[in-house]
């Protein structure tokens, strides 16, 4: 093998190895902050897992140089439990946290924003959509036409409630709707508590409709109109530290992306979004 080929191979191996050390050391999610700063992190896309957001929040919480956090939210929401987990972590971060809404911060995206001390949105931001949704598909007639029969063994009458293989009974609907409404009231209770609004007003607002940022402010659902930069400036004023650095935390990447610095968009989000379940999700068409 020619000498120059060996050199190229050696360099490639070294780069990959060095990159792996950086990844494994966790120096890409806010650990490289070297001076007192306001950290700006992003939560975007549909929410089906809380681990990435919470990992970043945890690092910012434990970094003594981070004096405050701006959470930029650009999400229509997603699964109920991950949305709740992120909300809880933001609420209990122990540092000043402001939420800054992007194009969309609705349903679960609005919920996680409620954990912040103050909420900012652009006048044109789409937010609100306070509610829960569950989409179910019934394929019984199709299965009958093609001669496919479903055999189900179950321990109770409602174990297969919502199954696509049989028609849903009224009692099935009631059982599932009871669960859905309990999740809904958990959401509205948080809105009442965090926004200081009367229950009657929240229940009027929480019918699933979306609002612009301007409408949301008029209804008391957010605090301020403005971008994340305004939020950062206001936090500096609140802390009385006008010279604080503003550090934008890099968005988390997959292990392969971290090692190779390549990224690719997949259809995974679309595949996941077809899952059956209860969602704090704004279905904006």
Regions found by a protein language model. Give the residues of each.
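Hydrophobic/aromatic residues within transmembrane alpha-helices
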Residues: 112-113, 216
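N-terminal organellar transit peptides
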Residues: 1-99, 104-105, 118-121, 134-285
């Amino acid at each position: 093998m020619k000498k120059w080929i060996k050199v190229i191979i050696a360099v490639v191996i070294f780069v990959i190895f060095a990159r792996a050390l950086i990844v494994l050391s966790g120096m890409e999610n806010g650990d490289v902050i070297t001076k007192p700063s306001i950290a700006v992190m992003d939560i975007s896309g549909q929410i089906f897992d809380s681990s990435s957001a919470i990992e970043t929040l945890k690092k910012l919480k434990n970094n003594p140089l981070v004096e405050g956090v701006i959470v930029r939210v650009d999400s229509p929401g997603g699964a109920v439990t991950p949305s709740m987990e992120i909300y809880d972590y933001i609420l209990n971060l122990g540092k000043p946290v402001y939420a800054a809404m992007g194009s969309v911060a609705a349903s679960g995206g609005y919920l996680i924003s409620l954990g912040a001390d103050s909420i900012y949105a652009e006048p044109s931001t789409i937010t609100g959509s306070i509610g829960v949704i569950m989409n179910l598909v019934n394929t019984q007639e199709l299965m009958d036409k093609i001669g496919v029969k479903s055999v189900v063994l179950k321990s109770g009458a409602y174990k297969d409630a919502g199954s696509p293989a049989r028609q849903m009974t009224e009692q099935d609907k009631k059982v599932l709707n009871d669960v859905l409404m309990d999740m809904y009231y958990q959401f509205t209770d948080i809105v009442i508590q965090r926004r200081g609004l009367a229950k009657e007003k929240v229940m009027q607002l929480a019918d699933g409709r979306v609002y612009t940022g301007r409408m949301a402010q008029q209804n008391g659902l957010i605090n301020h109109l403005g971008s994340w930069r305004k939020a950062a400036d206001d936090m500096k004023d609140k802390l009385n530290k006008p010279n604080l650095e503003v550090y934008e935390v890099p968005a988390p990447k997959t292990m392969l992306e971290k090692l190779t610095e390549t990224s690719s968009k997949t259809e995974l989000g679309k595949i996941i979004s077809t899952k059956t379940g209860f969602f704090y999700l704004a279905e904006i068409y």
